[in-house]
Amino acid sequence: MARQSFKTRLAGVASLALIPTLLAAQTPAPNPEAPKTAAPVRAPEPGADDSSVFPAPQMVEGLPFETRPPEKADDKPLFPQQTRAPYHKAADYTVTTITNKLHLPWCIAFLPDGKFLITEKENPGALRIVDKDGSISAPIAGLTTLAAPDKLGLLDVALDPNFARNKRVFFTFFERLQDGYSNTYVAHGVLDETAGALYEVTVIFRAIPAAPVKNFSMKQGGRIAFAKDGSLFLPIGDRDQGTPWMVAQQTDNDLGKIIHITQDGLPAANNPYLHKPGVLPEIWSIGTRSQEGLAFDPKTGHLWEIEHGPRGGDELNLIKPGKNYGWPIITHGIDYPGVPIGEGITAKEGLEQPVYYWDPVIAPSGLAFYKGNLFPQWKNSVFVGGLRGRMLDRLELKNDKVVAEEPLLTELHSRIRDVRVGPDGAVYVLTESDRLLKLTPK
């Protein structure tokens, strides 16, 4: 796609002219280079069904805590500890509940004064400030310029790297459009804490195309990760699209991709497909599914992503420019009816393997690398929230490989939506229902 046509699209975003019929008409043409495979059956996201009970993991030092058979009966990892890494307990911790009065919280950001900026996902979507004592503000004003409350869903929120100077916050949201369509957007605004409002709210990016879904909040992606230069990385979910849209493998749409844009919403200058005909210039990588975590490792600078698999095959991926992460051609999971997806293969030349995968699934949501000093035992750790797993999973990394695993917070039996490491070195966790938790050393 030429840069001019991208700017035309951006101009439409900036004007907030969200025209559902136009978006719905933007069905992508098939990519002739994309391998063909049978599309998975559309079904609820793993973890959405609370009727199943996730068994308590066994905690035996040096042995995997997962003992159930994999969903894909003949599945075998392609290298040691690609799945079911040995259990290792690293540190004792204390859990403090800051508040249990939130409504479907989705993301945490840390304000310089020690307060928390938290998104509540939907019904209606809201942005709130939570004080250290647990008091919760009224919804931040200014979001009604984006969409009506019953059509708006908030996802991630992140402070501009220069927030101390410009008070700007970036956030992602989705909007319910007509006829069952929805879409994912990136916006920013200037936060006035005293007034409890966002000003100068501007949409900078709209994923294309809008997509029909049974549940308008399904597989939106939406996490934000800032690069050192201030540009934004953002996953866009595949939106559960089946035949004939093998969208994650097609390069004329944003679905099933990691995108990389400037703070103005333009394609970043170092993107791998910037001048390639037929490829959206914002694309950084392709072939991902329903990504609910994206973060940079502060030690290596490497970008990591987590995504939901189907039945089995949740993934932790090391994201590199121009790479294809394989969905739905390869997967360590199976389709929801219990049959193979496509050819039922887990590897293919030219397609990236996950660094780690979970089978059965944990339904991962939220990704954070430990970078504090409160828990020296957690150095080299990355945390992954588990919705269906009802735990906070700690993975220990060495040379970009998982060498140990430790499920935390299993005693709470809570679906974990987000995890962040605070400026104080404590680990902060959102449960899907209503709680903000703080983990400190015991």
Regions found by a protein language model. Give the residues of each.
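Boundary at the C-terminal end of the N-terminal hydrophobic targeting segment
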Residues: 23-25
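Repeat-solenoid scaffold signature
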Residues: 279-320
